[in-house]
Amino acid sequence: MSHFAMELMQLLSVVKLTHLPYKGAAPAGIAVMSGEAHVSFLVMPVAQAQIRVNRLRGLGVAAKTRAPVIPQVPTMEEAGVKGHIALQWNGFFAPAATPRAIIDKLHRETVAALSNTDVKQRLADEGADPVGSSPAEFAAFFRSEAAKWGDVAKRSGTKLD
């Protein structure tokens, strides 16, 4: 997602950068801290830990609202990049032929787990904002995200290799 977040920023702003692909947030974060790279979009657990100890400077959070774990960092929109939302999310998937009763049970158990106070706190400490949407809502969200990032890939000329 970090690669696409950078491409989206370039599409929405006058900023143009040379893309340096890293294999994960940890190597990308190290590259920025060492001066090998100038900027990177990082996942919240990596970024917030380094921002807190002043090894990285947070320039913008790619979300609609500021992150509670690093409230001093503005959103990308507040930083001047209008419409820059690039959420890192995880989905829970099952094979298409899974019986509805099993899907419903998995959904109930997932929502229950995400409602647990300890689970919510641990996720919040990592900068996560858990959402227990319905299977239909998640399917709509997934389709929307696929369309959005497919468009970013096309407009930016991104190629898989």
Predicted feature descriptions by range:
Residues M1-D161:
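Conserved, function-defining micro-sites of small-solute handling proteins
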